[in-house]
UniProtKB/Swiss-Prot annotation:
Belongs to the eukaryotic RPC34/RPC39 RNA polymerase subunit family. Keywords: DNA-directed RNA polymerase, Nucleus, Transcription. The lineage of its organism: Eukaryota, Fungi, Dikarya, Ascomycota, Saccharomycotina. Component of the RNA polymerase III (Pol III) complex consisting of 17 subunits. Interacts with BRF1/TDS4. The keyword Electron transport does not apply. It is found in: Nucleus. This is DNA-directed RNA polymerase III subunit RPC6. PANTHER family: RNA POLYMERASE III DNA DIRECTED , 39KD SUBUNIT-RELATED (PTHR12780). DNA-dependent RNA polymerase catalyzes the transcription of DNA into RNA using the four ribonucleoside triphosphates as substrates. Specific peripheric component of RNA polymerase III which synthesizes small RNAs, such as 5S rRNA and tRNAs. Involved in recruitment of Pol III to the preinitiation complex. Involved in the configuration of an initiation-competent form of RNA polymerase. One of its GO terms (biological process) is transcription by RNA polymerase III. The gene is RPC34.
């Protein structure tokens, strides 16, 4: 007996049943020969291979090699119908593009693997592109190469360069704006009282009590940027970490622990002065200044037990 599956593909009842069972496990599910025999309740390998061959002829199943073992994978009816309309050369070119996934494949690699003439390959690619089966994308690693992938897929980060690239070009303006936003956000945690008190105050490192959280995490930064909608691309904690490491390299941040950063006092002073390092003479005077606890006491938050503390009437630093 024979049956029909959607899109007009003629199949026997056994082939239709096997395909339905394979697709019920989800797109991309792989099956061994033994698993297919068990699903169909077929003891004879010859009978199973007859059904599998029917599905192969209709492009409703394909062979996939996994860990040196040959397995079977079901194909959507719409995808099979698409291949049914292709010429033999187009189907061959399409199969290599499909296998390349989100990494894509270079047009010259297609020619080498298919052993087709350059003119035939270009004709197939043009036809597949016009039908929106495949598309060409730019690679940041190989800008002169024409990379092809399935039309429905999004290129991998290795191809696009991630959020730092726009149309294959490094977006310096976008990166610099994010670096400024990240630094500003972290500085509000490191110096919550603002920066103006450093303009004429002591140019020394600020000390904190152990219970003071004067840093920001990459997750906090990401949540802030996402909520503020300052980026039109999706960022990840790894992207934020990369930005923070750039600021660490520029001595604008220092790493407290894993994925935790705080701004440096030098970056605050540089921003307030509008210039780089202070003059050598002023630096020498700073080094000679005596340390006084009164210049730093505001950085230690009051404790709820302070009222019970007994102080000496007089004490010396």
């Amino acid at each position: 007996m024979s049956g029909m599956i959607e899109n007009g593909l003629q199949l026997s009842d056994n082939a239709k049943t096997l395909h339905s069972q394979m697709m019920s496990k989800g797109i991309g599910a792989l099956f061994t020969q033994q698993e297919l025999q068990k699903q169909m309740g077929i003891g004879s390998l010859t009978d199973l291979m007859s059904i599998v061959q029917e599905l192969l002829d209709k492009n409703l199943i394909k062979l996939v090699k996994q860990n040196d073992e040959l397995k079977f994978q079901g194909v959507l009816e719409s995808e099979a119908q698409k291949k049914a309309t292709m010429s033999a050369e187009e189907a061959l070119v399409y199969s290599y593009i499909e296998a390349s996934g989100r990494e894509g494949i270079w047009s010259k690699t297609i020619k080498a693997r298919t052993n087709l003439h350059q003119h035939v390959v270009l004709k197939c690619l043009k036809s597949l592109e016009s039908q929106r089966y495949v598309k060409s994308v730019k690679s940041v690693k190989f800008p002169t190469r024409k990379i092809y992938m399935l039309y429905s897929l999004q290129p991998s980060v290795d191809i696009t360069g991630g959020p730092w690239f726009t149309d294959g070009e490094l977006d310096i303006e976008f990166i610099n704006s994010l670096l400024t936003i990240v630094w500003r956000f972290i500085s509000e945690n490191t110096f919550p009282n603002g920066f103006k008190n450093f303009e004429n105050g002591p140019k020394k490192n600020v000390f904190y009590a152990p219970n003071v959280k004067n840093y920001s995490t990459t997750q906090e930064i990401l949540e802030f940027i996402t909520a503020a909608q300052v980026a039109n691309v999706e960022l990840t904690p790894s992207n934020i970490r990369s930005l923070c490491e750039v600021l660490v390299y520029d001595d604008k941040l220092e790493k407290v622990t894993h994925d935790c950063y705080r701004v440096t006092l030098e970056s605050i002073l540089q921003m307030n002065q509008g210039e780089g390092e202070p003059e050598a003479g002023n630096k020498a005077l700073e080094d000679e200044e005596e340390f006084s606890i009164f210049n730093y006491f505001k950085m230690f938050p009051a404790s709820k037990h302070d009222k019970e503390v007994v102080y000496f009437d007089e004490w010396t630093i």
